[in-house]
């Protein structure tokens, strides 16, 4: 999980979602997991 000031999709399978007021990127590739913070 990377914590970054701005989250971006890295590949086509990345999905940007909001959970509990946080912006997350979830993906099949675990290296692409990101959280905004």
UniProtKB/Swiss-Prot annotation:
PROSITE patterns: RIBOSOMAL_L36. Pfam families: Ribosomal_L36. GO terms for biological process: translation. It comes from the Bacteria. Keywords: Ribonucleoprotein, Ribosomal protein. One of its GO terms (cellular component) is cytoplasm. GO terms for molecular function: structural constituent of ribosome. Coiled coil: none annotated. PANTHER family: 50S RIBOSOMAL PROTEIN L36, CHLOROPLASTIC (PTHR42888), LARGE RIBOSOMAL SUBUNIT PROTEIN BL36C (PTHR42888:SF1). Belongs to the bacterial ribosomal protein bL36 family. HAMAP family: Ribosomal_bL36. NCBIfam families: rpmJ_bact. This is Large ribosomal subunit protein bL36B.
């Amino acid at each position: 999980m990377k914590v970054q000031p701005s989250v971006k999709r890295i590949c086509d399978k990345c999905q940007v979602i909001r959970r509990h007021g946080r912006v997350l990127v979830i993906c099949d590739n675990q290296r692409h997991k990101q959280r905004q913070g």
